[in-house]
Amino acid sequence: MGRVRTGDPVRRMRVFRGLRGPVHPPRRAVVTVGVFDGVHRAHRRLLLAAVRLARRRGGTSIAVTFDPDPAVVLNPVRAHPALMPLEARLARFRLLGLDAVWILPFTTRFSRMSARRFIDAILLRRLRTTALIVGESFVFGRHRTGDLAMLRATARQRGMEVVPIRELRQGGAPISSSRIRQCIAQGRLAQARRLLGMVPTLYGVVVPGAGRGRRLGVPTANLRMRSDVLPPHGVYAVAVHDLACPQRRWRGVTPQPRGVCGT
């Protein structure tokens, strides 16, 4: 797992799931909202801004995120693959020092919630948000009608502060999860690393193989991948949970006595 700059020290992070959220409203909640797929450099700028502001004010830093990704519900045919599973995102949030995460189940019904109702029902009634950290191009709510201008106008009426964070760019374009997906899929891993701010990470579960590598004196670990975005077939230098010994990874098709399988 690539190293990230964290909000030091790492605290215990509470995780809330479902529409109900926290039973008791958090103290002086400083909130940021997003999917945060990949938890890349631009995401970390938002998340760390929430952590630091909450600590300065003696409040609670909270990330509101969604599962599944809204794109899977709104346009399942064209939905983009995920850079990392939810549990990996939560691990990154914990390293960054967030006090809490609220995972909202994104459904077709939830997608019909207006931007104004999201502010009133989620941010104010449930969280009693005092400050909301957002990117300059942040949009939300049904038909993406909520933007920075609407947020500011509504927040002014509700007594909530909106803190816009300047867009982070690399190579003349905004850093985004979609750019990183494209880089990994095309094998441009050095560029993906620059956008992520850390080494690209793949997630999988070791599964039994045929044992031919072990019989040849070169034991291998076969992975059933949990990552949806994979690099092209090839041989890559890898690290496994920061082990010091060098590793190599083959991504491709493995010949089998009765056919082939992807590895």
Residues covered by each model-derived region:
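Phosphate/ribose-recognition catalytic cores of enzymes acting on nucleotide-derived substrates
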Residues: 209-263
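Classical nucleotidyltransferase
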Residues: 109-219
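N-terminal catalytic cores of NTP/NDP-binding nucleotidyl/phosphoryl-transfer enzymes
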Residues: 22-85
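A glycine-rich helix N-cap at a beta->alpha junction
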Residues: 85-101
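Glycine-rich, highly charged phosphate/nucleotide-binding loops
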Residues: 81-89, 113-119
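Positively charged, low-complexity intrinsically disordered leader regions
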Residues: 2-30
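Residue-level signal for inorganic ion chemistry
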Residues: 40, 93, 132, 192, ...
